[in-house]
């Protein structure tokens, strides 16, 4: 249909549901050919009477039968209207939303950049902490090994010290036992010697009593009494000589 020419009034629509019996309109089934494309009819909306007049009305209005959705004269919204709507929306977005959108995109970019920087920093910090933990774990294992070696060495030293003390105690106890045994042996010998001497003296006295009479005892006493003055005189002379020599 050309603009400016009157569009004939369509005949009364006949229901198509009975003829097809498939539950859908022609052109909407999986095997039906696609419906025609409305490029520019009805930029404003639906008006069946105005659409039938042709001319500029065909540009502004399109036909659509509300009673019969399967009417072959029905026209979908024009493709040009979608293009115009999209262009108008793009113009509005560019005219009024370019700066806010640009700022939002810039802010979003800064936010993403900051988040990436934070993520990179957190990753580096995590790697550093991981290295620190690994170093601490390594040092901990080394420290445990050193402690085990130190404890083993200390145990050996303590063992040697205990054995040395036990040996010294054993030697000292043996020496003390030997000393006590020797002292007891000496005491026993002394007691035996004393007892033997006493027994010998008693035996000698008894023997002398048996062999020496009373006359012999009197003679010994007299000789002893006679020897006393001579001993006193000799002692006096030696004392005088000593005094003269000192003078």
UniProtKB/Swiss-Prot annotation:
Reading the lineage from the top rank, the first entry is: Bacteria
Q: Does the keyword Transmembrane helix apply?
A: yes
Q: Which GO terms describe its cellular component?
A: plasma membrane; proton-transporting ATP synthase complex
Stated role: F(1)F(0) ATP synthase produces ATP from ADP in the presence of a proton or sodium gradient. F-type ATPases consist of two structural domains, F(1) containing the extramembraneous catalytic core and F(0) containing the membrane proton channel, linked together by a central stalk and a peripheral stalk. During catalysis, ATP synthesis in the catalytic domain of F(1) is coupled via a rotary mechanism of the central stalk subunits to proton translocation. Component of the F(0) channel, it forms part of the peripheral stalk, linking F(1) to F(0).
Q: Which UniProt keywords apply?
A: ATP synthesis, Cell inner membrane, Cell membrane, CF(0), Hydrogen ion transport, Ion transport, Membrane, Transmembrane, Transmembrane helix, Transport
| Ranges where the record places region Disordered | 1-33
Annotated GO molecular function terms are: proton-transporting ATP synthase activity, rotational mechanism
* Record-stated family: Belongs to the ATPase B chain family.
Name of the protein: ATP synthase subunit b
Is 4Fe-4S found in the keyword set?
no
Which source organism does the UniProt entry give? Sorangium cellulosum (strain So ce56) (Polyangium cellulosum (strain So ce56))
Q: How does it assemble?
A: F-type ATPases have 2 components, F(1) - the catalytic core - and F(0) - the membrane proton channel. F(1) has five subunits: alpha(3), beta(3), gamma(1), delta(1), epsilon(1). F(0) has three main subunits: a(1), b(2) and c(10-14). The alpha and beta chains form an alternating ring which encloses part of the gamma chain. F(1) is attached to F(0) by a central stalk formed by the gamma and epsilon chains, while a peripheral stalk is formed by the delta and b chains.
Pfam families in the record, alphabetically? ATP-synt_B (PF00430)
Entries under InterPro entries matching the protein? ATP_synth_b/b'su_bac/chlpt
Where does it live in the cell? Cell inner membrane
Residue ranges annotated as transmembrane are 79-97
In the bilayer, the protein is annotated as: Single-pass membrane protein
């Amino acid at each position: 249909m050309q603009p400016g020419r009157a569009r004939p009034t369509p005949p009364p629509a006949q229901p198509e549901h009975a003829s097809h019996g498939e539950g859908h309109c022609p052109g909407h089934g999986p095997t039906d050919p696609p419906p025609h494309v409305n490029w520019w009819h009805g930029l404003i909306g639906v008006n069946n009477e105005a659409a039938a007049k042709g001319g500029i009305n065909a540009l502004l209005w399109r036909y659509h039968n509300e009673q019969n959705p399967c009417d072959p004269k029905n026209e979908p919204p024009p493709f040009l209207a979608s293009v115009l709507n999209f262009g108008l929306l793009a113009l509005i977005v560019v005219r009024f939303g370019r700066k806010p959108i640009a700022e939002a995109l810039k802010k979003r970019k800064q936010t993403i950049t900051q988040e990436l920087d934070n993520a990179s920093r957190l990753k580096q910090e995590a790697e550093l902490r991981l290295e620190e933990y690994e170093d601490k774990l390594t040092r901990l294992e080394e420290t445990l090994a050193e402690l085990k070696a130190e404890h083993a060495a200390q145990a050996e030293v303590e063992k040697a010290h205990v054995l040395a003390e036990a040996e010294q105690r054993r030697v000292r106890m043996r020496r003390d036992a030997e000393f006590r045994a020797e002292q007891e042996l000496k005491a026993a010998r002394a007691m035996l010697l004393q007892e033997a001497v006493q027994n010998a003296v008693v035996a000698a006295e008894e023997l002398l009593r048996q062999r020496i009479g009373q006359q012999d005892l009197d003679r010994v006493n007299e000789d002893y009494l006679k020897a006393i003055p001579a001993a006193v005189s000799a002692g006096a002379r030696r004392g005088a000589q000593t005094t003269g020599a000192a003078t």
